[in-house]
Regions:
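Hydrophobic membrane-insertion alpha-helices, especially the h-region
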Residues: 7-25
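Juxtamembrane proline-rich low-complexity "stalk" or linker regions positioned immediately after a signal peptide
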Residues: 27-80
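Conserved, compact domain cores that house catalytic/ligand-binding motifs in diverse enzymes
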Residues: 115-121, 128, 132, 269-362, ...
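Catalytic His-Asp segment of secreted/periplasmic serine-dependent ester chemistry enzymes
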Residues: 26, 290, 352-439
Length: 439
């Protein structure tokens, strides 16, 4: 094709797109889903006139027109507007400090000098790399004793800044995906199993040569990356058919069976486990075998379970009824964990502020304030503590300020490491202040 024809072709395409931008409103909404594109005015940099300014201009034009003289006006053109979904009001009792529901956890801390006290921190991608959990762990261990990073999966696909993990199989270092077959309760269907035996971390590695050749002889090397992650004992959670020995930072495993977790910890003090579940809504715990969870929580003296979920529901839902259904599902998970760990306290950390672009501007996703209040209400009704990360940050639009200060990423959703430290410190300070009030 000659250069002139290419130019004409491109010009026609651009003209067609410009025409669509002039005619179409800049977005199409189907149920709760929305597709956006820039209008012609935005592309050309033409200032956007506010709704108030438009109304004032219309009033001035109408005032300048002569009074009608029995003129028959045509029927106005019907404009189909995007339906606005009313967000229901959520009444929350703000007079009760939800830390009152952490009493059993606070009481367990008195025993930390003679026995192990375990805290589990479940969450979505906001806590990957040990983010936020690290600050909670360091503060609790500094005050009540304890050491080690706690639970680790056999194959760590998402690197942690606290512990560097490597796998050796068939005499050479391999990528986690090349190791024993992994199953995850929060993963795609092909990675799930029917028996519900995922273990306390919601994932399991199966050593079996028929699944992955050479996977019945594995070495896991787990090296702490800072002094705060040092430990004095190993714990291995696996089937009895899996044999192991430890040497320094290495675990040598052999046999055929399931490995649910490794743990670097101490025999007394506080152990805080980081359990991220990427892409998870938090509605998967009921798929994990009840007996398996109950046994771990009881035998490992789990006295606090932290759940940090909800953010993954926000970008894909604009309907309050959908958000309400998700919170209902989270309520079921809370009740399930309460039944598995009746002696433990539960703390729910709500989603942070999250931003989306609308007409070229960053705004808070409209469902976040609603979900935050629904979660707070649910927590009070289920007798669990609630920390509003959204309110701590400053409410709607606060993520933009965190971005400006280098605390949040360019996506307007995830924290930078500095932001995660700030949020983690805020959570543990809030917890410790409650403990001091109890005394």
């Amino acid at each position: 094709m000659s250069p002139s024809k290419v130019f004409i072709f491109i010009a026609c395409i651009m003209a067609g797109l410009a025409g669509l931008s002039m005619v179409l409103p800049g977005r199409v909404v189907y149920h709760e889903y929305e597709l956006r594109w820039p209008t012609l005015a935005e592309v050309l940099g033409i200032p956007n006139t506010s709704q108030q300014e438009c109304e004032e201009i219309e009033e001035e034009i109408e005032a300048s027109l002569p009074e009608p003289q029995d003129t028959i006006l045509p029927e106005p053109t019907k404009v189909i507007e995007e339906p606005r979904i009313e967000v229901p009001r959520v009444a929350v009792d703000s007079t009760v400090d939800s830390r009152v529901f952490l009493k059993s956890f606070y009481a367990s801390l008195d025993q930390a000098d003679t026995k192990k006290v375990r805290v589990l921190h479940y969450g979505d991608s906001q806590i990957e790399e040990d983010r936020m959990t690290q600050q909670i762990r360091e503060a609790l261990q500094s005050r009540y004793g304890g050491s080690g990073a706690g639970l680790l999966p056999l194959a760590q696909t998402i690197p942690s800044r606290t512990v560097r993990q490597r796998l050796v199989m068939n005499g050479k270092q391999i990528q986690p995906a090349q190791g024993p077959q992994r199953y995850m309760v929060y993963g795609p269907k092909r990675t799930q199993r029917e028996d519900g035996l995922y273990g306390v971390m919601g994932q399991v590695a199966v050593m079996n040569d028929s699944l992955v050749s050479g996977s019945e002889e594995v070495i896991a090397i787990c090296t702490p990356q800072d002094n705060n992650a040092r430990y004095n004992t190993w714990r291995i959670f696996a089937d009895s058919s899996v044999h192991y020995r430890t040497s320094g930072d290495s675990v040598y495993l052999s046999g055929k069976g399931s490995v649910y977790a490794l743990s670097q910890e101490s025999k007394t003090g506080v152990i805080v486990d980081n359990i991220p579940m990427r892409g998870c809504l938090g509605t998967v715990f009921t798929k994990i075998d009840r007996q398996q969870l109950s046994s771990f929580y009881r035998e490992q003296n789990v006295t606090l379970i932290i759940m940090q979920f909800g953010g993954n529901a926000i970008p894909f839902n604009r309907n309050p009824s959908t958000i309400s259904s998700i919170v209902k599902g989270l309520r079921e998970q809370v009740r399930y964990l309460q039944s598995c760990a009746p002696e433990a306290s539960i703390l729910f950390i709500g989603p942070s502020d999250m931003l989306t672009q609308e007409n070229g501007e960053w705004i808070t996703y409209p469902m976040i304030p609603y979900m935050d209040r629904l979660l707070r209400k649910m927590a009070m009704e289920e007798n669990i503590a609630y920390f509003s990360l959204f309110n701590y940050m400053g409410g709607a639009g606060s993520m933009a300020r965190w971005k400006e200060n280098g605390l949040a990423g360019s996506d307007g959703i995830h924290f930078m490491r500095s932001g995660a430290r700030k949020a983690g410190n805020a959570v543990v300070q809030w917890i410790l202040e409650g403990e001091e009030m109890e005394r």
